[in-house]
Amino acid sequence: MKLLMLCREPRLYSCQRLKEAAKRQGHEMDILDPNRCLLKLSQNPPHFQIFYQENSGSKPYLLPDYDAVLPRFGTTSTQMGCSVLQHFEGKGTFCLNLSQAFLNARDKWKSLQLLLKTGVPVPNSFLSGGEVQAQATIPHISSPTILKMLNGSQGIGVILAEKPQSAVSIMEAFKQTNISMLQQDFIEEAGNADIRCFVIGDQVVATMQRIGQDGEFRANCHRGGKTEKIILSDDEKQIAIRATKAIGLDVAGVDLIRSKNGLLVLEVNASPGLEMIEKTSGVDIAAEIIDYIEINAFINLR
């Protein structure tokens, strides 16, 4: 098969692992930056064409047909990346995570709405409109509370406010820069630990527990946390699978937290990193992803 990965940083561990796994299984893989794509819509066939400019001085060339597309772009490329994905969808190409599902996952508030709508447990959460005074949110939030930027990643834009007035001050400051923030109950009993599940299709293929540094409430590895192996029950795995389906994804990193009221879903990531979870779990996730593409791209072609 001829595969395409949409990614701005081809040297990243995850991109290299996926390319190696594809090559090992006899496939070609191109890695291209979605921000260098030119999309063309035509009334007459071919209706969907995609051109690519290698650099600022080169002439854009027409991309060939691909058997499958893997989106691995970051939050700064979401809009263009999803436009490119949608173009491939228009061409009938199999995409590992559709554009709408990708957009769902990148919107933290919409994700929570979709999860709760389908019965997936999430922390109590709160979002106020731009004309609502921050002070008016105090009766509706717990203390301490977590504040999150709607499009943050890797723990960036996540703040712990110990007191209600601190939360108000933070919200007022961000409001000045037109940045909306959602508020969530702080799950104190979980300490500084959470769980990452890697879901492919109908299976949880790998898990790990993430533990934040001393004095750090965020468990993200990018914030200096450590990881450990963890075994989940079948019921806990089902929550991660249901969360993935609620967002509409084929492949996802689902972040879970254990609370006194049971397991809760914190977030569903459409482009989860492979490095820490492969090294912690010992699972060759890259090969599992290529296996999944082989099966589903073939079904898509029939």
UniProtKB/Swiss-Prot annotation:
Catalytic activity, EC: 6.3.2.-
One annotated GO biological process: SOS response
Residues that bind ATP: K148, D185, F186, D194, R218, A219, N220
UniProt-annotated binding residues for Mg(2+) 1: D255, E267
Cofactor(s) needed for function: Mg(2+); Mn(2+)
Residues where Mn(2+) 2 binds: E267, N269
UniProt keyword terms in alphabetical order: ATP-binding, Ligase, Magnesium, Manganese, Metal-binding, Nucleotide-binding, Protein biosynthesis
GO molecular function terms noted in the UniProt entry: ATP binding; metal ion binding; ribosomal S6-glutamic acid ligase activity
Family per similarity comment: Belongs to the RimK family.
Protein name: Probable alpha-L-glutamate ligase
Species of provenance: Haemophilus influenzae (strain 86-028NP)
